[in-house]
Structures are given as C-alpha cells and as structure tokens.
C-alpha cells in the first residue's frame, strides 16, 4: 500500500491549524479531506472512512459536541482506525480519556511537522498491519474444515466463529 492511496481526514474548527496540517500532509503525498465542525465530520466519516483521522478535541465552541464524540463514532464503525487527537488546551486527563476511548495518539498544539508525520505514518502502518493480520487470521480459520454436519459439530463451528472475532485471549 503506497502513501499516495492513504487518505487522512483532518477535523479542526480552527481554519489555520486545519490548513497547516493539510499542507504538511499533502506535501508528503497524502490525500486530504477536511471538516470544520461536528456535523460535517460525521457526514465525511459516514460517506467513507479515512485511513487516519486527526481530530481536535474541542470543536463547535457553541455546541456540546466535540472531538471525543467523533472519536467514539469512528470506533463504533471501525475499532482499528487510527485516530490522532489534538488539542491546544490539553491536560493529562484529556489525553488519558482519549487513549482509553481508543485514540491512537494524543498531540498537544503546537506540534512539529516531524511529530505529526511520525504519528500519521505510524497510524497508516498500524492500520495496514491490522488489516493484514485479520486477513491472515480469516485465511487460517477457513483453512481448517470440520467434516460432518451433526448438531455438536455445528455448535463447535459456531462457537469457533464467535471466538475468532474476539479481541481478547481465549483460554
């Protein structure tokens, strides 16, 4: 998967920050989509998931919908999608809360272009590895076949199918 096909969704209500992030990433060959508010961001996400999302924690100063709500929305659709949360008013609790909800990284403004690119490149690589891992797991799971159609074999097959989709360890 080359970098040209990687699509990044940048969500920030601050036009200058949004354009700066977009410019840095475009210069490195990424395809960029932008959103400036909650409603627009949800529309973009529902239209097509990006490879990585960069979301400002504090959006829509007039409303109560913010970047955390967008993070939660994305994770319901695709738990593996890397989301980088950014904030100009960050504190440790905000960072911890974001990471607990599934954020890939948390960056405080201002940040260097090197740090931004590092996080985005790692996010893209992480997503690629998770997709490959799922593909290989599916291939492995489907390469073993049970012979028979008895009630017990069917129950075992159903149970294995459910267990194979779980993120946690099964003992």
What are these regions (language model features)?
Residues 29-38, 44:
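Short hydrophobic/Thr-rich beta-strand motif most characteristic of the beta2 strand and flanking loop
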Residues 101, 109, 149:
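A Lys-centered signature of the CheY-like receiver
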């Amino acid at each position: 998967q080359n970098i040209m096909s990687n699509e990044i969704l940048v969500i920030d209500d601050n036009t200058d920050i949004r354009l700066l992030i977009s410019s840095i990433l475009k210069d490195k060959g990424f395809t960029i989509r932008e959103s400036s508010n909650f409603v627009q961001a949800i529309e973009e996400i529902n239209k097509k998931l990006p490879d990585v999302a960069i979301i400002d924690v504090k959006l829509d100063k007039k409303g109560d919908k913010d970047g955390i709500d967008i993070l939660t929305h994305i994770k319901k659709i695709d738990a593996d999608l890397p989301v980088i949360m950014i904030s100009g008013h960050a504190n440790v609790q905000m960072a911890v809360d974001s990471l607990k909800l599934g954020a890939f990284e948390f960056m405080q403004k201002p940040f260097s272009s090197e740090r931004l690119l590092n996080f985005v490149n790692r996010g893209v690589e992480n997503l690629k590895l998770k997709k490959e891992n799922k593909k290989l797991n599916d291939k492995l799971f489907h390469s073993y076949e049970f012979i028979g159609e008895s009630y017990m074999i069917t129950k075992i097959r159903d149970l294995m199918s459910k267990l194979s989709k779980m993120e946690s360890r099964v003992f």
